[in-house]
């Protein structure tokens, strides 16, 4: 990097950003790769508006060739993103306790059909089918904030099977088509291998995944605690309970949909949850809960019939109204602990909003598979670098909303 391509100053951020870049990207074999990683990070942190490669380069250096070099680094340079993600994971874990591993979903709208993994898909936010990429991120929930540390891109079968498409997008031979459920499990498996702290509960929105039943069975058999929202149409059966335990009345073993069971409100002792905080008006929610079994989660092996807790929120006078239905294998946990984990899912959704608005989540313009992963890795690093100091500062100044949960009389 010549004097003309040296990054513009970041004032007090300079030294710490240098150290941060060296820690995460020190594995890159060439010095110029490490320098361009630093330029990209600085650009993400300082460039207002759209985070195109051209704008990132222009905000950091006056070099007329910087944009081309940065484009080469992101889209064509064959560097491995996994070591950087593992180091980012360790960097975050060293600085803050992790409350949950949260799975977030992201839709990346695209105009053309040449970006890797592009396909037609229904986007709930848009309310219609869109041309897009679709991916999952694993977030570390830190209590007040969630930080992404790993990503997976859905590769539809046509992209996986067509050698021309694979070659054009530079898809590695070991990358195959995987279902959304398999990608979620892959993220959790990778996290379990690389984390340096105790395993945290998995929190995820599986409400639009057709294979949610088998997936929760696989999570349980891998030894993970989990709390996930499930499709209302998922078949469950009441597990039954001793009288007075507050479980749904009805015939144990009879199959019913999760949504119907949650909407029935047939609970002897419902919970009342009070959501309160320094900046929010308290909200009172009724929580209906029951023990269930999930036929689709069973492995078929003897002794594998597991019991789960299913619950949903009921606003007074309004019923469930199609709200989320949650299920967990943490049947012995207090309801207030479970509702605290529900909030972690909302935190990852807020993080996705911030990544979109401030860190260029949807701004990657390249078409290659490695380029997508390079951008997502650097974007996650920039977000963590900015977010963790802000979280510590905020936690020092004010508390966070708490859920007071008690059984109603």
Residue ranges and their predicted role:
Residues 78-158:
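Active-site-proximal, Lys/Arg-enriched surface segment
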Residues 2-71:
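Gly/serine-rich nucleotide phosphate-binding loop at the start of the catalytic core
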Residues 56, 99-109, 138, 200-209, ...:
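Short, conserved catalytic/metal-binding motifs centered on acidic residues
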Residues 126-199, 322-323:
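Electropositive, glycine- and tryptophan-enriched low-complexity nucleic-acid-binding patches
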Residues 1-20, 24-33, 155, 245-297, ...:
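A short, flexible helix-boundary coil/loop motif
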Residues 146-147, 152, 227-231, 236-344:
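An anionic, glycine-rich sequence signature occurring as long contiguous blocks
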Residues 169-241:
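Domain-level cores of phosphate- or acyl-group-handling catalytic modules
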Residues 332-366:
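Short amphipathic alpha-helical "interface-anchor" segments enriched in bulky aromatics
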């Amino acid at each position: 990097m010549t004097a003309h391509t040296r990054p513009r100053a970041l004032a007090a951020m300079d030294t710490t950003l240098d150290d941060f870049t060296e820690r995460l990207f020190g594995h890159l074999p060439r010095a110029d790769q490490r320098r361009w990683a630093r330029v990209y990070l600085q650009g993400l942190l300082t460039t207002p508006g759209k985070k195109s490669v051209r704008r990132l380069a222009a905000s950091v250096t006056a070099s007329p060739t910087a944009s081309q070099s940065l484009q080469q680094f992101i889209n064509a340079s064959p560097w491995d993103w996994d070591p950087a993600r593992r180091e980012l994971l360790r960097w975050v874990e060293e600085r803050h306790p992790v409350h949950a591993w949260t799975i977030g979903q992201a839709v990346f709208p695209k105009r053309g059909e040449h970006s890797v993994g592009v396909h037609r898909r229904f986007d709930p936010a848009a309310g219609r089918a869109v041309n897009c990429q679709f991916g999952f991120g694993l977030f570390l929930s830190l209590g007040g904030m969630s930080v992404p540390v790993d990503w997976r891109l859905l590769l539809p079968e046509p992209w996986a099977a067509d050698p021309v498409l694979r070659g054009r997008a530079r898809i590695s031979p070991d990358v195959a088509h995987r279902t959304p459920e398999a990608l979620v499990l892959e993220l959790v498996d990778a996290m379990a291998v690389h984390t340096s702290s105790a395993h945290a509960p998995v929190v995820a929105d599986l409400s639009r995944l057709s294979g949610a039943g088998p997936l929760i069975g696989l999570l349980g058999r891998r030894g993970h605690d989990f709390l996930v929202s499930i499709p209302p149409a998922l078949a469950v059966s009441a597990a039954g309970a001793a009288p007075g335990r507050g479980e749904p009345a009805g015939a144990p073993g009879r199959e019913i949909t999760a949504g119907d069971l949650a909407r029935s409100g047939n609970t002897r002792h419902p919970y009342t949850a009070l959501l309160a905080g320094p900046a929010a008006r308290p909200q009172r929610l009724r929580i209906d809960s029951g023990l269930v079994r999930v036929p689709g989660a069973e492995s078929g092996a003897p002794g594998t019939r597991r019991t789960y807790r299913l619950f949903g929120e009921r606003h007074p006078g309004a019923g469930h109204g199609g709200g989320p239905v949650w299920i967990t294998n943490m049947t012995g946990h207090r309801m207030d602990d479970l509702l605290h984990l529900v909030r972690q899912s909302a935190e990852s959704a807020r993080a996705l909003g911030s990544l979109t608005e401030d860190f260029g989540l949807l701004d990657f313009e390249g078409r290659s598979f490695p380029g997508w992963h390079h951008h997502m890795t650097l974007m996650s690093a920039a977000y963590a670098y900015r977010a963790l100091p802000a979280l510590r500062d905020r936690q020092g100044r004010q508390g966070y909303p708490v859920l007071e949960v008690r059984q109603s009389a």
